[in-house]
Every structure is written in structure tokens, then in C-alpha cells.
Amino acid sequence: MKFVNIYEIQRFDGQPTRHGIAPKKIFRSKYIPTGLVPRLKYWRDVPSRAEMSKRIGKYFEDEFKFYPNEEKLNEAVNIVQEKWISHYGTSLNVTSVSESFRTLPKSTSAGLPFKSGCTKYEARNKMMRFARSQWDRVSKELQLQVLPCRLGARCQLRKRGENKPRLIWAYPGYLSIIENQYLTAIKKVPPPNFIGWSTNWLDGGKSLNRLLFGDKWTWQSIAQIDFSSFDATVRTELIFHAFKILRSLFDLTRTENIMLDQLRHYFINTPILFYDKIIVKNRGIPSGSAFTQIIGTIVNMIACQYASLRSRDYNLRIPFSCWLGDDSFLNFETALCRQEFEYDYLEKFKELGLNVSIDKTHYTTRFIDDFEVRFKGVRPYVKFLGKQIDILLDLTFHNDLDKLDAQMALPEKEDLSAYETGVRLIGLVWAYGAHYDIYLRILKVYLSLKLKPEFHVQQLLSYSEKPERTKRYQENFFSSMKYQLNLDLDIYDLLAFPKFWDVSNRYFGSKYERLDFRSHKIYG
């Protein structure tokens, strides 16, 4: 693989390349009255150089010795591979460059050598032309030309006093297109139940019903594993196994095989422009790759299956479990105490070099003590894909009202008008408003904006006046509504603040179709 020195490259606009991140303070939205959202207990991360150095340093910490059982590891890989092949087959074909670009998120960074802030949509022609030129190089047995990733950060909400900005590897856009040519072929096939792509919390309770009752309540225990620094600690051996499984799904030509080898090499040995120097990692998963989620999912499946094979009593049921990245919802045939679960199952992850956060890992059995539930208020639950699944058959979403206040008042990007604030609040009510107290809290803030519905529609749909702002409205609106929440409502329905029962029915089903969760036996 040919590495291109960043200092020898001029940006397409002829200006020098910027290094690092310029940290800026996140201010409260000026359109939300302070009286409605009082003193906030949360703030957003600040991507200072010191904190970003800590994040990147996790990819280079000394590795402790780990000795997996090779026989069990290979068996786990074969089991996971069999599950993927049984659903996708072995004859997928790589898609074209243009089709790949159509399925990429258009508002994300185009990476180097484009200027900071340039989106993939703005750089689409040059990106696709460069991607095609790389296919020509590989077909002539030349090395893939690569650029380092651009440094980025995600400023998430934290309790005051904490600061842990999330490191983003902003991939060069042309490499994202080439990677996505493989991924698009996979996403054309409806996902199996064991991949989180099949889970949609706004499907009338079907996903919840499948997770809890898809096996007619025959599970004995369920768990959710929380990893510490999962992306930074994944070892190269596991990534090789994941790419092996990914490759087995395709019928590849010689050129496509070579290209996948070089993409894997870049995925493992990823360079990043880190302020005034270029750093190259040799382990871990980079966050900006098109392969990030699917490789992380396969690695997670392999690790969980390996721990199951190495434990004495935990038989993992893959068809009724679910994974997405480092998130997991595990279904077991055995019910033992929490201490036994930690000793017999969680300890096995250390053999693969993965760190499990014991305190944040949730485990519960179907044998729930009736006395503790009724008189002590014990509510066993697991968390999956940002939601809290109560085993007593109640789906909860956002109990931390202080954090909800911060989400309303502290936008990650500055609100350009009250109408953009309204769009964010509509997104929040669809994401968290299935409980009435939370719904009313968001509605109260929304009404304080005093928006005119017809002007709201005009601002979002019109390109005629202030096109740079209307474009921003559209990008924020459609990315949150269409991509993240998977809503299939008409756009004019989405622009109005929804009624409570419309939101509730999306999560739990209508009163005629609502799942009768209480009819299931929940006590052992």
C-alpha cells in the first residue's frame, strides 16, 4: 500500500491543510427560555488536545498477555461464519461506485485532501473520480494510494466535571466509497434477527416482542455486555477473523480480493493526522470507516460465542440474541446467580484481550423474586441500542430528566433559528416521548417557541431564500428523522409536533394491536 505524505499534498482549493481541532465552547440555545430549563447538571465534552491525546493513547497502551484457546476460538469463528452464510449466502457481488455513493451519508466529512467542513455531497464528483482511479490502479497490480484520516471529535453529554470527547477517524471520502461498495451489497439483503439492523423501536413493539418472546419465553437468562474502550482494544487477530467471515459472503474477482486485502490493511494500520504529526495505529477499530459497525458486530459475536464455549454452563442462543457494534442482547439457556455469571462467563473475555466493565454489565434471569419486585421495588433490566428493557415487561427510554433538559438546551451544533430548535424537539419527542411525563416536558418547551406551522414548512422545504440555511434545516431534519429513527411518515406529518398516542403507538402498537405483554409468564 502506497502511503502519500500529507505535507506533499495540496488541498483541491490550493490552501494548506489544517491540523487538529479548534475546541469551542458549546453555548445554550438562545431560543429556549432559561426558566423552562434551569441550571443544567450536564455539559458537552470539550475536545481539548490533552483529552484527545488520552483518547488516541488507548490505541497504543501496552497490551497485556492473553492466551486464547485456539481450538475454541476457531470453533467460535466457524459457528459465527455459518450463521452469516446461512442468511446471506456466498454469492454477493460488489456494487458500483455510483451506487455506493448514493447510500453514503452525504452530510459527513469528505476527509482529506478536502478542506475542513467539506461534506461528501459537496465533494462527490472528485471523490467518485478518485475512487474509480484506485480501482484502475489495483487492477494493474499497483498499490492503493492512501491518505491519513482527519482528526474529529463527538462532543457528547456528560455530568459536570467529566470530559471524555469521542475520537472520530474521519476517513478519506474515496476510501469510504470503496468500502461501501462491499457493504451496500450486504445491506440490500434484509438483515437477520441476530444483527441490530433488524431492530427498530418504532415498529409498534415488534422488535421488543421478538427480543423477549421470540422464543416463546424459553430463555433462562439474558445479559448485556458493556465493554471498556472496545474499539481501541480489539486485537488484530480478531479483525482478521471478522474480515474472513465478511469475505466468505462474496463471490469476488481477483481485483476485488486484492482491494479488500488492502482495505483491511488500512483498517488495521490506520494513519491519522493528529495535530502536528501523523500517527499510525496497528490494532483497534477506526470509528470513521464504512466497515466499523459490521466488523465490530462480527468481533462482538465471536467474543461472546468464544466465552460461551469456554464456560461450563452458558449456552449462547445466537438466533434469539442480537448484536450491533459493541452492543449486545444475549440469550442463554442457563440461569445462574450473578456472581457465577461474572466468574464463569465474563472472565473468558480477558483471554481475547477485551475489557468488560463489570459494573455496567447487566444480567438477569427469568426467576424473579416476587417479594423483591412487590416490596423492595427491584426492577431487573438490560440495556440495548440506547433503550432500557425492563424484564417486567415495560420498555423505558429516558428516565434521566436532567440529561433530557441538557439535550434540549445544549445542541451539538448551534441553532440558527427557533425553527431549527423546533426540529430538534420534534426529533427528541419521537426518540424519548413514549412516556407521558417526558412528552409533556418536551411539549412545554416546544410551545414556548411559538412557531407558525406554515412558516416552519416553508423554511424546511424551500430553497428560494437563504439557501445555505434551508439546506442546513433539511440536513438536520432528514438525518434525524429518516436515518436515525427510520420513520416512514409523510414529511408534513413530521413537521408538526406529534400527539402522545401517535408516539406511544409507534413504540407499543395501537390499542387494537398492542402486544399483551402481561399475558406472558414472568415468574419462574
From Swiss-Prot:
Keywords: Nucleotide-binding, Nucleotidyltransferase, RNA-directed RNA polymerase, Transferase, Viral RNA replication. It catalyses: RNA(n) + a ribonucleoside 5'-triphosphate = RNA(n+1) + diphosphate. RNA-dependent RNA polymerase which replicates the viral genome. Pfam families: RdRP_1 (PF00680). SUPFAM superfamilies: DNA/RNA polymerases. Coiled coil: none annotated. Its EC number is 2.7.7.48. InterPro entries: DNA/RNA_pol_sf (IPR043502), Rev_trsase/Diguanyl_cyclase (IPR043128), RNA-dir_pol_C (IPR001205), RNA-dir_pol_PSvirus (IPR007094). Residues 220-340 form the RdRp catalytic domain. The keyword Flavoprotein does not apply. GO terms for molecular function: nucleotide binding; RNA binding; RNA-directed RNA polymerase activity. This is RNA-directed RNA polymerase. It comes from the Viruses. GO terms for biological process: DNA-templated transcription; viral RNA genome replication.
